[in-house]
């Protein structure tokens, strides 16, 4: 709930942070890695005219190209070596996770612990290279079909672009893993977060420029700012929201001692699937455009027609976007949370839900509650992701942040702050244990 977020903020101790040497090293490592990433977004791919490319990006700033460029921190607009960002890795991760539910081999690897996880991660890396190479080739062919952007079109440009962009994605994948292991927070999420936030000053500058020139009134600008803050507060509230199921454990007798009955809760997050559904839905909707780039606009008429209908902000795009978000919210929740396994574990340790028979009935009840919670979470995701699209397309109100970007920024911020708080608590416990041991030794 929102109170949990307030509690987290109130307990954040900046004095303890200043004394936490290990945590400060992790934070400095994370900042250094993100600086390297940002520098890479300014190293251009050879063979591209930056002036013509900037013109193309400006013409498509409110379309699909602008949306991808925003997630990449402007790297795509500069055709930098990190133009693909980490998106191929995310797509590969999602595909592997979805395949785990239908592939017996991957399902078995998932149950093998650390070794199985390493194998699955290796498959994800292979998938990342394949997807990055395909997307890089699609971009190179698409640029060649856009006039004078490519200085020397041909196979040499295509191959060099594929190698450069794929190498950039692989490096970002490695950098994200290093941040996760040696820094603070989830490395992949922080890379996307930094790319989105890096363009925030430009977006705010463009908004206030519209106000200065009189294209937007002061009241409209104030409404956009207040509305954005309200959406952020709404995201924080929902991301913290839980449906708690009461779990009871019977009295236990150990020797002559009888332990009292215990109570606990099984928390079901309102948004169990996180930001995965909108990201994967966007990836699927980008597929026709990628295929169209391969054909350089000379493909069949039906493909060009579908590509036009799926343009950013088109009614069909919005309708399919909502449908895919809802579908993947349910699908991914089913992968992340298994009611049968949860019911079996409760029965194994003697836990039960009051009024519900342990075993199959408990699994059915958990699935019943989870389905309704997921429905609310799916509608929440669809609302947040489509609201900026709807206001931009039909009301003419400019929004710098898309709904997916807002979800990523807020979720990553909350997770990173929670991890920092966890490190501070662990340090305080270590100091408390040391003091207790010293007092015991003195006695």
Place the predicted regions along the sequence by residue.
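N-terminal cationic and glycine-rich segments that engage phosphates or anionic surfaces
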Residues: 2-110, 115-443
């Amino acid at each position: 709930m929102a109170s949990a977020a307030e509690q987290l903020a109130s307990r954040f101790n900046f004095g303890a942070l200043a004394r936490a040497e290990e945590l400060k090293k992790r934070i400095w490592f994370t900042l250094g890695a993100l600086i390297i990433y940002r520098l890479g977004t300014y190293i251009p791919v050879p063979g591209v005219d930056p002036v013509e490319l900037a013109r193309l990006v400006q013409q498509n700033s409110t379309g699909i190209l602008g949306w991808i460029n925003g997630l990449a921190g402007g790297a795509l607009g500069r055709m930098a070596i990190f133009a693909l960002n980490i998106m191929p890795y995310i797509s590969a991760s999602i595909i592997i996770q979805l395949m785990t539910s239908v592939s017996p081999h991957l399902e078995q690897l998932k149950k093998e612990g650390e070794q199985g996880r390493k194998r699955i991660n290796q498959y994800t890396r292979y998938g990342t290279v394949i997807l990055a190479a395909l997307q890089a080739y699609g971009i190179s062919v698409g640029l060649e079909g856009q006039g004078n952007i490519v200085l020397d079109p041909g196979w040499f440009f295509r191959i060099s672009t594929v190698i450069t962009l794929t190498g950039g994605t692989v490096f970002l994948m490695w950098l994200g893993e290093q941040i996760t292991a040696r820094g603070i927070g989830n490395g992949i999420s922080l890379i996307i977060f930094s790319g989105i936030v890096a363009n925030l000053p430009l977006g705010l500058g463009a908004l206030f420029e519209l106000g200065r020139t009189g294209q937007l009134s002061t009241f409209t600008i104030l409404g956009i700012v207040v509305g954005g803050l309200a959406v952020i507060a709404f995201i924080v509230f929902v991301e913290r929201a839980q449906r708690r199921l009461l779990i009871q454990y019977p009295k236990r007798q150990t020797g002559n001692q009888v332990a009292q009955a215990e109570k606990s809760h099984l928390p079901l997050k309102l948004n169990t699937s996180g930001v995965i559904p909108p990201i994967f839905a966007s990836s699927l909707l980008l597929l026709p455009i990628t295929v169209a780039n391969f054909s350089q606009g000379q493909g069949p008429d039906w493909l060009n027609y579908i590509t036009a209908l799926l343009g950013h902000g088109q009614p069909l795009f919005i309708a399919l976007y909502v449908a895919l978000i809802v579908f993947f919210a349910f699908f991914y929740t089913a992968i992340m949370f298994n009611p049968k396994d949860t019911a079996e574990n409760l029965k194994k340790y003697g836990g039960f839900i009051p009024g519900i028979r342990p075993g199959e009935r408990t699994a059915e009840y958990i699935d019943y509650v989870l389905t309704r919670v997921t429905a609310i979470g799916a509608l929440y995701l669809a609302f947040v992701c489509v609201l900026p699209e709807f206001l931009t397309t039909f009301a003419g109100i400019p929004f710098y942040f898309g709904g997916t970007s807002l979800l990523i920024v807020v979720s990553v911020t909350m997770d990173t702050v929670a991890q920092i708080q966890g490190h501070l608590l662990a340090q305080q416990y270590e100091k408390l244990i040391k003091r207790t041991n010293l007092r015991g030794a003195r006695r």
